[in-house]
UniProtKB/Swiss-Prot annotation:
A GO molecular-function annotation: homoserine O-acetyltransferase activity
Biological function: Transfers an acetyl group from acetyl-CoA to L-homoserine, forming acetyl-L-homoserine.
Lineage: Bacteria, Bacillati, Bacillota, Clostridia, Eubacteriales
CDD domains per record: GATase1_HTS
Name recorded for this polypeptide: Homoserine O-acetyltransferase
InterPro entries found in the cross-reference section: Class_I_gatase-like, HST_MetA, MetA_family
One Pfam family in the UniProt entry: HTS
Family per similarity comment: Belongs to the MetA family.
Length: 304
């Protein structure tokens, strides 16, 4: 089944051109099923890029998904056209009376700041608190995962000596876990962060399970036992060229940044980046939608 998004949203044409099944509202309304209501709190600077990335994976399942895009009121994006935000995004106040099957909270380039120093931290904590009663399962990405672990469980983040930047190998800790079902014994995923969470802090919380980790990148996928909260410390949604774009951006700013690891063939930036995480990303997003959301969310969201 397809993802349901407005036909004017840039992602509609992007995904259609990639032969991904998308559906506009008119066609979706003729189907006699209830779509999954998924909200995306998009904290990334280039919001249209992130929309395309996430919607690509949300559309790659047999489930019909209805997406609501959310922006913060306490901080206005400077990298996305205002007309796009006005047309396709809502503020939290606009949707807080609704209930959702799922919520995705993206990463944000603020991990070197203390959580409380982030401009929209208070608003984000209100959304995370609201999600306890209005969302069946929440999927936190990168800094969003660190923020969620800190808010819900007081798990701190730690500065890294150098940026975790590149594509790293990971393993699955529990082969029978629903969220990692279908992943190979070793799989790859991108990371792009200056901070980390530590296994020993997570292990102190009895309700949390570490489902996947990496020798080099550390803890990767963490989830509550009931799967109402899922935390992914990397960026499985990234496109082939995202790490390259970030590298070029940082070099142009004059930052000291090493080439992303395990990304360019022979570490040659003139070579096409190796796209080694598309399959694992599809599996993890699909498993979240199916096992963590669809199989358990109530048909009547008012009973949530």
């Amino acid at each position: 089944m397809p993802i349901k998004i407005p036909i004017e949203l840039p992602a509609f044409q992007v995904l259609s051109d990639e032969n991904i099944f998308v559906m506009n509202n008119e066609r979706a309304n003729t189907q006699d099923i209830r779509p999954l209501k998924i909200a995306i709190l998009n904290l990334m600077p280039k919001k249209i890029v992130t929309e395309n990335q996430l919607l690509r994976y949300l559309s790659n399942t047999p489930l019909q998904v209805e997406v609501s895009l959310i922006q913060t009121k306490s901080y206005t994006s400077h990298n996305t056209p205002p007309e796009h935000l006005n047309k396709f995004y809502s503020y939290f106040d606009d949707i807080k009376q609704e209930k959702f099957d799922g919520l995705i909270i993206t990463g944000a380039p603020v991990e070197q700041m203390a959580f409380e120093e982030v401009t929209y931290w208070k608003e984000l904590t209100e959304i995370m608190e609201w999600s306890k009663t209005h969302v069946f399962s929440t999927f936190y990405i990168c800094w969003g995962a660190q923020a969620g672990l800190y808010y819900h469980y007081d798990i701190p983040k730690y500065d890294l000596d150098e940026k975790m930047f590149g594509v790293f190998s990971h393993w699955v800790n529990d082969e029978k876990a629903d969220l990692t079902r279908g992943l190979d014994d070793v799989f790859y995923a991108p990371h792009s962060r200056h901070t980390e969470v530590k296994r020993e802090d997570i292990e102190k919380v009895s309700n949390l399970e570490i489902l996947s980790e990496s020798e080099e990148a550390g803890v990767f996928i963490v989830a509550t036992k009931d799967r109402r909260n899922v935390f992914v410390t990397g960026h499985m949604e990234y496109d082939r060229n995202t790490l390259m774009d970030e590298y070029i951006r940082d070099k142009e700013k004059g930052d000291e940044i090493a080439l992303p690891k395990n990304y360019f063939r022979n570490d040659d930036i003139n070579q096409k980046p190796l796209y080694t995480w598309r399959g694992p990303a599809s599996i993890v997003f699909g498993n979240w939608l199916n096992y963590c959301v669809y199989q358990n969310t109530p048909f009547d969201l008012n009973t949530l």
